[in-house]
Amino acid sequence: MKKLISIFILSLLFINTKADTHYINSGNFYYSPSSLTVDVNDTVVWLNVQGFHNVNFDISSTTGNSFGNPVSFISSPTGADTMYIHKFTVPGYYEYDCSVGSHAASGMIGNITVNAITDGNGVANGTSLT
């Protein structure tokens, strides 16, 4: 039993637990970068460079259909320097836009891929990825 506990504790050392913070600039009709890949537990900060914007991960402003994201959320429109901060805890592919005026129709759209944390053996959250 001691051997199993030791192996378990050692395996925890190899699990990626480091969380990063990523920044997206928001300006007149753009998010930069517009496409981003992060890991589960990473935080994304949207910075407002210019204008009045939000981040909408719920309903597409151009089609009126749900983005179908693993988790849906929307921030309030703001002109503040920091628009929104979100910690991604659910892996998957997320699409979003700015739902202020016609910003999305003018190209203010983006996507984020959230990768599951793996243990180095292709196992994420107890589920084999292979």
Give the location of each predicted region.
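Sec-dependent signal peptide recognition
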Residues: 2-7
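Repetitive helical segments and hydrophobic/amphipathic motifs
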Residues: 11-12
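Sec/Tat signal peptide C-region and signal peptidase I cleavage site
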Residues: 15-19
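Extracytoplasmic copper-binding redox domains, predominantly the cupredoxin/blue-copper superfamily
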Residues: 20-119, 125
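A short beta-strand segment in extracellular, disulfide-stabilized domains
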Residues: 126-130
